[in-house]
Structures are given as C-alpha cells and as structure tokens.
C-alpha cells in the first residue's frame, strides 16, 4: 500500500506539470496487475486515466500451447498463485493457475497425482520461454511469469 501511494504521488506530480504518462504492463492491466492500484488512486485524486486493453497472459499461453480455454459451456477459472490450491483444483472446467512460481513444487505434486490434463507456460512470448505438455515435466524452479492450464483428463482441448 505504501509503495502504491508513493507511486501515485509521483505520477500526480508529473500530471500536474501537464505531462502525459504511460504505465506499461505485461498482459492486460485489468488482470492481477499492479497498475490497477495506481489507477484507483489517481482517479480518486481527480485525475483522468484511460486503460488500454492488452493480451492476457492466459490467452497468449493458450494460443502458444494450442489449447482451448473454454469449449461449449465449460467454465473457466482464473486463479492467482495465492488461491488455495486444493480448492481451486476442485472447481469444474478449466483452471488457470497464475503466478504460481513460488509454490510450483506443490502445484506439480498435486497435478501429477491427480487425473488432469496439464500444460504450463513460463515467460510466454519472452526470452527464456518454456512450454510444458505434462505435469511430470513442470520445472519446480519455474519463475514468477509461469502459468498452468489444468483440465480433467479426457476433456476437450488440452
């Protein structure tokens, strides 16, 4: 919270000088992005702010992996790494586990022992990109920009 307040004050200083600002994000600024903390603060202070949509990491990863996220009436669940894993895996349909790098060993163990079709993308579209087709091959040292797409075995699209 303190760092977001500090950033908003700095941005306001530039805006007060008549400058235009851009806050670039990886992915879309409305999905688990730091930008939204800044956006809320600046608009609450009376500044105008426009959000320009980007390509979400899970859509980019699904395209790179040639995986359908949702077919027919299959629900899609986008879950942050901090979401309780067991609860998330019990949800029906497609589960996208985002930013799970810190706990990838735990994620991998749960997926290997379950009846899941799994794909993983790390650093999708960036240097060091890794694409994985099986839970057993998920690296336990996966980085921050890793996401896992989970479906039930035999489900279409994975």
Residue ranges and their predicted role:
Residues 6-10, 83-87, 106:
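Short acidic active-site motifs
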Residues 25, 79, 97-99:
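Thr-Gly-centered strand-to-loop micro-motif
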Residues 12, 36-39, 59-62, 105-108, ...:
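Predominant activation on well-ordered alpha-helical scaffold segments within soluble catalytic domains
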Residues 30-91, 139, 153-156:
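Class I SAM-dependent methyltransferase SAM-binding "motif I" and its flanking Rossmann-like core
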Residues 23-25, 51-54, 120-121:
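General beta-strand structural signal in soluble alpha/beta enzymes
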Residues 27-28, 55, 100-101:
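Short beta->alpha junction loops/turns
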Residues 1-48, 132-139, 146-147, 151-157:
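Class I S-adenosyl-L-methionine
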Residues 16, 21, 89-158:
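A contiguous loop/helix-start segment that scaffolds small-molecule binding in enzyme catalytic cores
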